[in-house]
Each structure stands twice: as C-alpha cells, then as structure tokens.
Amino acid sequence: MARKYSHIIVIGVDGAGSWFKDADTPCFDEIFKDGAVTYKALSSKPTISAECWGSMLIGVGPEIHKLTNKRVSVLPYSVWSKNPTVFRRIRKAYPEAELGSYCDWNPINKGIVERNASVNKQTARDKELTPLICDYIKDKKPDFLFVHFDSTDGAGHSNGYGTPEHIKAINEVDKLIGDIYSSIESAGILEETLFTVIADHGGTNNENGKGSHGGWTDEEKYVTFAAEGKDIVSGEIKEMNIRDLAAIVLYGMGIDAPAFNEKGWTAQIPKGLFSDYDGEYLDISHLTGAAPRISNEHHKSELI
C-alpha cells in the first residue's frame, strides 16, 4: 500500500467531548472548513483517559490493552506486546522515521508509547508545550507527531463539563491548535500533511459543580474528531469510534493494518473519510469494553 502522507499530526484534547461545537474556535473552524468533522465519534468504555488514549494509539479496546490511569502512571507499556502502538508499527515500517509525542499528561509517554520506538518525547503544560511543538515541527518535520493537551479536562473536573469555564478552556486550546497549524505552514509541509484533532471523552457534573467521567452518557461518550488533508472528503463523518484513529494513521502512512478481530484489532477506516477508500465499517457497539469505573482525578504533568 502506497504511503499517502509524508506527515501526520494528531492533536488530542483531553476531556473536550463534543463541546468544540459550542466553543468559540475560529482556528478549528478555519482549518476544517473543507475537512471531515464529527461531534459524535464514540469513545471507549470506560470513558477514562488511559483507556481512551490507549485505544486510539493501539487500535484495540480497553478490555484488550488493559491500560488504566494508575497503570500508565507507574508501568511502561510492554515493548513485547502483541498489540503495539502506532509508534512501534511506524518504526518497524520506516526505521528512519522522525516520531514525536508531546504530552501535557506524561503517563502517555511513560505508560503507552513504547520505550523502544525511538520517539522524541516531551512533557509540559499546554501553553509551555506549544512553542516546543512548533519548533519541533519546523526543525524536524516529523513523519508522525502525537500531541496531548490537558487543560480542558482540568477545567471540566474543576468547574463542570460544558460550563463557561470548560468552554473557555477549549477556546484557549483552539489558539494553540492554530499556532501548531501555522508552524506546519511555516515548515512548508502543509500539502503533504494529514492534520487531525480528537477528544477522548466528555464528562458529567455533580450537585457541587464538579465534573467526572467514566460512564456512558451522551455527554461522556460522544467526542469531536476532525481531519484535514488531501483525499479527505469534506463533510460530516457518519460513524466512527475513537480507536479508529489507529487505522487512520496506518492508512495514511501506507502501512497494512491487522485484520479485524473482535478479540484484538477493532480499529477501522470510517466510511467516506478518504476519497479513495470504500471498505465496509463493522458495528462494534456490542463489545463491552473494560470494567466500568468513574474518574474524578485531575491529571498531573510531570517532566520526563
């Protein structure tokens, strides 16, 4: 399979749910005005960060990868796992590829991205992280870059999801997304880049105005995904699960994905996303996910 893009950049926005549609996001709106967008991509069960980011980067459900926030905070992801991340798959296919993972929440770098994939890893708070990302893009022109922003989830936990404070945090992240997109233009690689934004989960609020997540309400399970690049079909994506990100990345890199298997790889290419792809899209709504639980925790950003 031929490689479609020289560069793929994924911006992950923790806890943003589907609220991009309610926020003031001029950068997001301009970037994806001719792209593919959905505010109803389905999260993973339970709707908690490690379970969700793990599913997106590995292409399997939480019941398969078994990652939790506690686990990724203390244990590195096995370099021998039969379910490798997209980083390891790309490294195998392209030994000289430049790979980056710039995350506010360091457990992604510590407990999901493999140690043997030769990934440039950085950790800082969102606003401090963004200039590092922009410099990295201009200097290294990465083949694949994953970015994780976390201020949105912190605002949701502290002030409630969908509240003015939470929406304001999304507004602020929109500016950072705009800065990153501008750096791609400055690097002269925009025409060969697949640029995506994705959230992992939303959240619900208690009587004290605090937010949590982990359940399967509409507010928790529906999230934003957007993609822009050549061969992306403009319009609404009708059906998608967040784990499909792994399949999208591999397809864009020209790497054959594993065969669909309900006990393993369940990432798929959403119908109508790419103009040159017309494969079937299988229903996985009956898959149970991992054991349910609720998260009230605020992530901490620790330097590597």
List PLM regions with ranges:
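Feature captures the catalytic ectodomains and active-site-proximal regions of enzymes
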Residues: 1-304
